[in-house]
Regions:
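A general structural detector for well-ordered alpha-helical segments in enzyme core domains, enriched
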Residues: 1, 30-34, 59-67, 94-105, ...
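Aromatic-lined carbohydrate-recognition surfaces of secreted/lumenal glycan-active proteins
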Residues: 1-27, 73-86, 113-123
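A structural motif corresponding to the C-terminal end of an alpha-helix
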Residues: 2-11, 37, 66-76, 105-113, ...
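Sequence-level detector for tyrosine residue identity
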Residues: 3, 45-46, 83, 136, ...
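Hydrophobic transmembrane alpha-helix bundles
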Residues: 8-19, 44-59, 112-123, 159, ...
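Long hydrophobic alpha-helices with heptad-repeat/coiled-coil character
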Residues: 18, 26, 46-49, 60-63, ...
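Glycoside hydrolase catalytic-domain groove-lining segments
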Residues: 24-88, 107-108, 112
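Aromatic-rich peripheral "rim/lid" segments of glycoside hydrolase catalytic domains that contact
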Residues: 88-94, 108-113, 117-176
Length: 176
């Protein structure tokens, strides 16, 4: 951080951690040390089961509180987030609830979270999702492929999923 600040004043230094990684007690000391010299904290966040069979989160407000606590006085950037509708136990209604809860929780912490990036606008092409899963070392993992392919708020064919209207309305109410 000192080098960057000296060489390129005004450049923000940060790194990304997944929310699941943030919760990993065995890595807590290393993650805290890595972030000790960052200006901002970047987190990737996917509610519930990420396709690998592990549930890393349960409720958006509680999870956001955990992220804010970790960030301390630094801004929290939600670098990528989403809710896949195709993984085991996930639904389109769940994606609507996720978007609703996200905006409500963001409103509660608006001064601390300057940016939120929803991971994917559109669901993926199944062939491309299978290839992407392979790059993660998860070739043939159908739940993970479904996770990658159903993160969008619009289908691959560009039809709106129920969460699209929720997202558009919530964004419009906030001037986006």
């Amino acid at each position: 951080q000192a080098y960057v600040a000296g060489s390129h004043p005004g450049v923000i230094v940060g790194m990304n951690v997944s929310f699941a990684g943030l919760l990993d007690a065995s890595e807590a000391a290393q993650i805290t040390a890595l972030f000790s010299s960052s200006d901002d904290v970047f987190v990737s966040y996917y509610l519930g089961d990420n396709g690998f069979g592990q549930v890393s989160s349960t409720t958006v407000p509680a999870d956001l509180d955990t992220m804010i606590a970790f960030a301390g006085s630094r801004p929290l950037i939600l670098k990528e987030l989403g809710y896949a509708t195709g993984t085991t136990g996930h639904t389109e209604a769940g994606q609507v609830a996720f978007i609703t809860d996200l905006f409500q929780a963001w409103d509660a912490h608006a001064s601390r979270i300057p940016m939120v990036t929803i991971s994917r606008m559109f669901d993926g092409d199944p062939t491309e999702c299978a290839s992407e899963a392979q790059s993660y070392g998860a070739a043939g993992n159908q739940d993970f492929i479904a996770f990658l392919c159903t993160l969008g708020v619009r289908t691959y064919a560009d039809a709106p999923k129920p969460a699209w209207a929720t997202l558009a309305s919530a964004a419009a109410r906030r001037g986006f």
